[in-house]
């Protein structure tokens, strides 16, 4: 049977029930008058209208008198021109670069973009800043990324400094058993590069040539700046022995200056006989002595271990830095001649850094990387020609000697290859640099173009013009 049709009485009763429920929720009374509900609705609507009117009024006032975007920003940049300005008290000064702006403001804040028209209504002061200071302050390399290399290409044709890990697979790292013969120019001393060091060798001395197997070897020509980056070892030459040819007191039956050997389970050991005992030496030192004076012996005499055991062990001759065995010359692989020699320097804690040599066909830059050619480049001259530091990065370093003793002046090196001295800790903080600087070799840093010192006093110098460069 169909339900009866809804009448107006049903609808009226339903509406009445809804009003009672609404009053109960709003006023806690099911019997509240409908006027109270009507008044609440009216006040809500009126409040919304007033809020809209107030918001429109604020927007109108902001349009007529906008609030300056300068606010309390210490450094701003004009949107239209990109010019930088720094606030000093209530005066805005144009500033030459971001490094100077941060030093003047004593903060590492970034510039806030503003309209040039806003700056037109402010107090303006003269130009401030350090000419030539970094315009951008890039992220410094981390300790694991900090490695230094100075390379010489084309027999002294150009020199390049590479900052960062060596990534060129064509470069061969010389092992401790390899060496390369170099000289800076015709007539200058010849050096043997081996084991992370350099030593002078006299190619006119037959004993040296034969002991190191340098017959027919022609030195590679390299820049002096590359040699300066290598720790120097004592000259490799036959040592002078006091009382040579006389009978030894320390080892009876043998002459002073003679070389003997004993056979161990691990191989042969060489000893030189001295007045008061014997000194252990390497194969190179043994050959140097024998090519100088073999004392008529065709072969190195072999003695029983118990014979030499009774002799005092001394350490008189300065031959400990000599290579133990004749190093193997590096001439490059077949079809790939050595055109570039590099000295690499990697910081190590504690003590001296690790120095190694690379030989290859070019500087060890990443694939696609191109070194920056410096304005001071002079080809075969003494100046550095190019620098590679990953674009958009910098290096915050402390100069260290090759011996590893202490740290000196701190520098910020930019990706354009210029080094800037850091005056103090406050300067480093204002520039946003890390707390600790990473060690770097001073002989390599010294080859980089030197920029002005970064200090708050230098940055605060007012100037009307900037003198043109040379």
Curated annotation (Swiss-Prot):
InterPro entries: T7SS_EccB (IPR007795), T7SS_EccB_R1 (IPR044857), T7SS_EccB_R3 (IPR042485). GO terms for cellular component: extracellular region; plasma membrane. Pfam families: T7SS_ESX1_EccB. Gene3D superfamilies: Type VII secretion system EccB, repeat 1 domain, Type VII secretion system EccB, repeat 3 domain. GO terms for molecular function: ATP binding; hydrolase activity. Its EC number is 3.6.-.-. It is an enzyme of class 3 (hydrolase). Keywords: ATP-binding, Cell membrane, Hydrolase, Membrane, Nucleotide-binding, Transmembrane, Transmembrane helix. The chain crosses the membrane at residues 44-64. It is found in: Cell membrane. Its main location: membrane. It is a single-pass membrane protein. An ATPase. Belongs to the EccB family. Part of the ESX-4 / type VII secretion system (T7SS), which is composed of cytosolic and membrane components. This is ESX-4 secretion system ATPase EccB4. It comes from Mycobacterium tuberculosis (strain CDC 1551 / Oshkosh). The lineage of its organism: Bacteria, Bacillati, Actinomycetota, Actinomycetes, Mycobacteriales. The gene is eccB4.
